[in-house]
């Protein structure tokens, strides 16, 4: 009986202990359900995270001190990467903004009141930035979201910002090589140190070396920059509203065009806005800002040159091998939608895994959390899920929520076909816009006056400051998908003029809080002096007619029945262009002017919509 009791006691003990003893034996690890990472209880408590910072040595010296620049990096990882030998992949964000930025006071920007083809007035220099230096945490971004789900989160300040050495170059090579160095360090190919100038090394023994990058705006640009280096270990990037060419950010078709909301900004202004590390400030300001940027960005003509070509990531796509989930808003007039499409198009042509997510809003806006989760789980954890299955393009329709996109075979919609529309006379009121090409339509003249906004001109029933051509009222919705292209034959009474084009839907929707898809369908700008070449402008001969063709922005929008689609041609766009004195006259030859719009269903769909 005594032996039986002893046996029972042992058995009871075994069944009482598993919740503690067996749990202690089981190591924490990522959890996957339906192809997605889940919150791991052992990773959830921030008190159990290891947070450290360090400096990673790069392969460049951008501040002229004779030493390789080091980038300030922070790391947040579950303690199990230290106590249990667990290795996890990395989600990495790099930014020039982490330590703070300069003033947004427009008095330090370039004055938009500038006559065309003239030297601008010197601008005021920014007051020094008072950096926000936090150690060991550079940023808390993405930490609460991804560390509990089985990732290590890494941040770095880009060159010349925060505690990172070097100079900001705003799209220069060092801004690509800096995140490359961090990824190299995560894979044991570069050195990390405990201090910016010491020799005590830090090694990344706690990671698998697989890295995904993400971020918005400038923080979305840097994943593209890193990917163009072809660095091993960077498996996937999810850029949101990235600036992929600084020429396309500050110029359009030869025209000086400011990003929406930042009138007077140029690349040297952005340099001042982000240059938060005061080390070597005088050298960086003199060599990078004044000599390289102001010396070559050309605020007189706006031509494309070697300076701008060196800051266009489309020119560096050859080595790229990371997968791409591109994200943008069709109504982003800060970083316009062409920035994302041109890179997506190039990656698609390379045959790399890629998809694109577009919403109808403005600047920023991540893809749905489930979509990001699946992409990171697939490429960083190796989970076999449906991240790459199904539609190539996910587009949020006009009245849907951002996390409820509609899938399409691709963007542009493969069913979209070009429909060419021709203007008929009507100035100073409204002209027509039709698929019927008629000769002898004559010429119409308008006068530039930057005092009037584009929206006021579009709403005006009578004005001599724009030309406005309107289709018949739509009897059915029209689905536009792709990139409109316009050809204008024009003459000017001066050697230079701004040229702006809007597509709008009429009647104009009056609302104290309009939706992004209300009213303005698309926009485009160009310098008529660049009618032959983007790299060499040519002063216009007053009275002589020139033909210029250029694209508007990528778009996917459904224009509802009851609306009319209108083409507005005007000169200075007060929210984007320079502001010359009013009075320049532009004359448009209607016989030589047309716009091609991409309509899903092509001419048949268009004919049904306008009743023909």
Give the role of each language-model region.
Residues 320, 326-328, 332:
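Short beta-strand/loop motif that positions the catalytic acidic residue
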Residues 91-96, 155, 185, 568:
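Structural cue for short, hydrophobic secondary-structure segments
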Residues 333-339:
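Conserved alpha/beta-hydrolase "acid-adjacent" motif
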Residues 347-364:
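Catalytic histidine neighborhood in serine/cysteine hydrolases
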Residues 25-115, 130-131, 140-142, 431-456:
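Catalytic-loop region of hydrolases
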Residues 27, 35-40, 366-612:
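C-terminal, loop-rich substrate-recognition/catalytic regions characterized by aromatic stacking residues
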Residues 27-30, 40-41, 59-61, 68, ...:
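Accessory cap/linker subdomain of secreted extracellular hydrolases
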Residues 147-163:
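Conserved alpha/beta-hydrolase
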